[in-house]
Amino acid sequence: MKEYDYLFKIIVIGDSGTGKSSLLLRFADNTYSESYMSTIGVDFKIKTVKIDNTTIKLQIWDTAGQERFRTITSTYYRGAHGIICVYDVTNKLSFDHITETWLQDIDKYATSNVCKLLIGNKIDLVDSRVVLADEAKHVAEQNNMNYIEASAKTDSNVEKAFTTIAKALKDKVTQYPSNAPTSTVNLSNASKVTTNRGISDSCQESSVFKKMNFSSGKCT
């Protein structure tokens, strides 16, 4: 019996220190640490979710935000069905880099129909906030993205963020079932991964991603 109906590859991008790893750990393992080590290269988590009686396996790639790792992480855009852009609501520069750096990388390396989601993290730091929600919503609308505010620390909207993009991917693949594939990825081809543990980990998941062709990148 099949363990899941769909397998989607999602990558998480954004500046270093925005809480990408914390969001992923909160979602995948329900854990949080104030002293989590910055990702070196690329790491990943796998989690299965149930949406509308459909079992969806998510392989979520956590990428390093430092400039020196961008050559490594750019290769993981290829074949991604969804991309989550994360900024820190208390760090204006991390927000500016969404349009100045990360969305440009998406245009350069990802497929044109990739599903995108913008997350404003660390909303628990109310007194330190410098990026307003309306400003972020405007950027999201201009770039065909949905927007969610979250806090990995308090677990606010974390599951909602990941299930939102998972549902959008599921809805699109069921809406266009007969379209030709544009993004079929065999995970065995990406088995060697540089992770934040400083070693080459082996991804044992060898299934092929569901074949999809999306008409729009927005998660609706």
Swiss-Prot record:
<feature type="binding site">
    <location>
        <begin position="121"/>
        <end position="124"/>
    </location>
    <ligand>
        <name>GTP</name>
    </ligand>
</feature>
<dbReference type="GO" id="GO:0005886">
    <property type="term" value="C:plasma membrane"/>
</dbReference>
<keyword id="KW-0449">Lipoprotein</keyword>
<dbReference type="InterPro" id="IPR050227">
    <property type="entry name" value="Rab"/>
</dbReference>
<dbReference type="InterPro" id="IPR027417">
    <property type="entry name" value="P-loop_NTPase"/>
</dbReference>
<keyword id="KW-0547">Nucleotide-binding</keyword>
<dbReference type="GO" id="GO:0003924">
    <property type="term" value="F:GTPase activity"/>
</dbReference>
<keyword id="KW-1003">Cell membrane</keyword>
<comment type="function">
    <text>Protein transport. Probably involved in vesicular traffic from ER to Golgi.</text>
</comment>
<keyword id="KW-0813">Transport</keyword>
<dbReference type="Pfam" id="PF00071">
    <property type="entry name" value="Ras"/>
</dbReference>
<protein>
    <recommendedName>
        <fullName>Ras-related protein Rab-1</fullName>
    </recommendedName>
</protein>
<keyword id="KW-0653">Protein transport</keyword>
<dbReference type="GO" id="GO:0015031">
    <property type="term" value="P:protein transport"/>
</dbReference>
<comment type="similarity">
    <text>Belongs to the small GTPase superfamily. Rab family.</text>
</comment>
<dbReference type="InterPro" id="IPR001806">
    <property type="entry name" value="Small_GTPase"/>
</dbReference>
<feature type="lipid moiety-binding region" description="S-geranylgeranyl cysteine">
    <location>
        <position position="219"/>
    </location>
</feature>
<keyword id="KW-0342">GTP-binding</keyword>
<dbReference type="InterPro" id="IPR005225">
    <property type="entry name" value="Small_GTP-bd"/>
</dbReference>
<keyword id="KW-0636">Prenylation</keyword>
<feature type="short sequence motif" description="Effector region">
    <location>
        <begin position="36"/>
        <end position="44"/>
    </location>
</feature>
<dbReference type="GO" id="GO:0005525">
    <property type="term" value="F:GTP binding"/>
</dbReference>
<feature type="binding site">
    <location>
        <begin position="62"/>
        <end position="66"/>
    </location>
    <ligand>
        <name>GTP</name>
    </ligand>
</feature>
<feature type="binding site">
    <location>
        <begin position="14"/>
        <end position="21"/>
    </location>
    <ligand>
        <name>GTP</name>
    </ligand>
</feature>
<keyword id="KW-0472">Membrane</keyword>
